[in-house]
Regions:
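Catalytic domains that recognize anionic headgroups
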Residues: 1-117
């Protein structure tokens, strides 16, 4: 599918840009797809089936986190790796980004931040 190919291309460009600036800046990327995609599994194509009958390919979405060396020293990377098989939601994205950027707000829930133990 061309959109998957383009997403790979785009992410490689973003990572290249971040890496090229990681000596001067703290850089990180957290990518989460908004939905999965069926590419012919069980005769299904595309996405958008009702949740109760949608196959795992549409529900379980990819996520990718990258931190440069300086950010990896600030955050517990092993703690993040230990969460890779946990079921997560977009709720985690909001709180993880707040924690990653050091934003203090009463809305922040440390329990939903992937960067915490």
């Amino acid at each position: 599918d061309n959109t998957i190919l383009y997403a790979d291309y785009f992410l490689s460009k973003v990572l290249g840009l971040l890496k090229s600036n990681s000596q001067e800046l703290d850089t990180a990327m957290f990518y989460v797809s908004d939905h999965g995609e069926s590419l012919g599994e069980n005769g299904l194509y595309l996405h958008g089936m009702p949740y109760f009958m949608a196959p795992d390919e549409q529900i379980d979405v990819p996520a990718l986190m990258w931190l440069n060396d300086s950010m990896s020293k600030v955050f517990d990377v092993e703690s993040i790796k230990n969460k890779e098989d946990l079921p997560l939601s977009h709720d985690n994205l909001f709180h993880t980004l707040l924690g990653l950027m050091g934003v203090e707000t009463k809305l922040y829930d440390k329990g939903l931040d992937l960067m915490t133990k």
